[in-house]
């Protein structure tokens, strides 16, 4: 039934728009004549490589495939910080993480920060938000904060439970992530009751929590674990035979930051191939459920005759490692964590186009303003994606000059014991750490080594040096790292003073309690030594 509907859909709702009504750019700042509506759907933890071959073979994603066929897909889109709040802060501000000082899941934008949605509202758009936002300061657990603040301390503590899977008993259950479905329903109802009757163009944002792993409510050995949770209905969308078992480096050969991450994520123990494959299968099933919610929005737009004048954008805050590089979650510059989906469909957007240029989430802000015809602030880190996706600009030579040939991503939060900076160009991925000297950098040739298994930084010193110089021209990363060190220490001292002398007992009840309770005096001593050490 879905295939039949998609064929009808392709012939009608997404027919090429009249070039007189759309598809033209207005001035240098841009803007579509006729002020199209915009719908932005942002999921959590979606590996962008699933939206194109060969990753797309592992799971059925019909509505993402629909957007690919009738719109533009960006093959090399990246998060600007592979963790929820800092990534979303970059998307809503159009600025790199270090410019807004969105250092961790607790430290994001000021609640009164002017976002692209605020500007679109001032330019005549009716605006609405549903679901997960998570770009302002003050959220997330004490565990998450303390773990981020103390990452400079010289100890190793498991901060996560071992990743798990859970198949719900009801085989036919479709709405597994009920909270996301409720927000999707709210968005659809708003389209029907408000947007369809509005004389203004509208911009609708829907934030989904899927396919982020679920927190485990269990206690005991797996307390605090993350659970990949789904039903048989969604597992049937996964091609089990197409699931790739990732290669792992021996623990003794891992990069020191990778080892720290793997240890704190409780992934240094033994995992069978079946365990790994099941975790990945359940994750892909959660991606299929995410795709269905995106589909509900597209279906509603079609049914309300809004689709022909609505630009639909789908992306995610970051990816999910799903046991690649012996890790789950994100917090890494490896492809599974940093590579995100980014698809655009609608009036003036070229159909069935794949753009290989590197782009990132800071590009959402100028893109939104460009659609609205609003002037672009000069201080933005991002660039409008309209020239890359427009029917009028499809020229290989011009495309190279429409966006810088690099993107920047940085990470300063928990589960990683050094500030991390990634410069991605067409062929290379360069990853620098901390002050640039105390931790060895990494260099990967993504053309010959897409799985990022061989660090060639010392083998190609000229390339490494050149990329490091380029990175330093964009961001003074040793200085930023020092600022984060100081921030972490100041925040921990404030928190420690707020809980009094029993702070050790408080820590003993956080996620890392199992390790802390074995040798509390040892870890208290390590913290005291860290607090005394000047940076």
Swiss-Prot record:
Catalytic site positions: 84
GO molecular function: arylsulfatase activity; glucuronate-2-sulfatase activity; metal ion binding
Signal peptide boundaries: 1-22
Record field: catalytic activity: an aryl sulfate + H2O = a phenol + sulfate + H(+); Hydrolysis of the 2-sulfate groups of the 2-O-sulfo-D-glucuronate residues of chondroitin sulfate, heparin and heparitin sulfate
Keywords: Calcium, Glycoprotein, Hydrolase, Lysosome, Metal-binding, Secreted, Signal
Alphabetical list of InterPro entries matching this protein: Alkaline_phosphatase_core_sf, ARSK, GAG-degrading_sulfatase, Sulfatase_N
Binding locations of Ca(2+): 44, 84, 317-318
Post-translational modification: The conversion to 3-oxoalanine (also known as C-formylglycine, FGly), of a serine or cysteine residue in prokaryotes and of a cysteine residue in eukaryotes, is critical for catalytic activity. The 75-kDa precursor undergoes proteolytic processing to yield a 23 kDa form.
UniProt function note: Catalyzes the hydrolysis of pseudosubstrates such as p-nitrocatechol sulfate and p-nitrophenyl sulfate. Catalyzes the hydrolysis of the 2-sulfate groups of the 2-O-sulfo-D-glucuronate residues of chondroitin sulfate, heparin and heparitin sulfate. Acts selectively on 2-sulfoglucuronate and lacks activity against 2-sulfoiduronate.
Protein name as catalogued: Arylsulfatase K
Originating species: Canis lupus familiaris (Dog)
Gene assigned in the entry: ARSK
